[in-house]
Amino acid sequence: MLFSTISKERILFDIVLPTLNIINDMYSRGKINESEKLLIFTTALDLALMTKFVGTTETEQLKAYCMIISGSEESTYMARIASVILHLIGWHSLYLGSIENKIDPFFDIDIQRLITKKLSNVEGLVVIQIFSFNANTLKFLSNTIKTLRNKFRGDLRIAVCTNNDLLQASEDMDVDYTTTELTSLIEWTKEEYRNSILANS
């Protein structure tokens, strides 16, 4: 499947993500246990990463940069897949990982320094994507990253992908986009890039 002519992006959207949604539903209804869910999720993440490395090398690299941060264990798989998809369509994509258990009084400064070091001087669009199903880390990350808006040469966008329970709260956080759907987030990210090209042409 990985070496077929099927779009690698479509493999992730049409096969991997629906499978994970089904597994989540089965777990919530008690049809599978925690270890079975973990095994399937880990296998799906392995597939996503393999898709990244067998993806076409002919994709044009865009002047578009994204750092993806997970704020909860449950959102990690979506964050990893988002990173792979953006890589496959030509973005410079960085996946920081999950920070759910890393927060301390100085960690906000640590994240700000990292993002500034990696992305503040690049030319083009920069998008920071926050994936979190945890109210505390979602608030922490959005507040931490919003303070960087004035430190970037180019355009900086902040997007949040969360669950239905936290969607309303995320919409009140003064970020550029909020959603519960990975497909919607990717489409919004593409549209922001197209708009940035038009604005700078």
Please place each PLM-identified region on the residue numbering.
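Conserved mid-sequence domains
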Residues: 46-141
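Peripheral docking tails and interdomain loops at the edges
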Residues: 157-201
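Generic structural signal for well-ordered alpha-helices
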Residues: 142-146
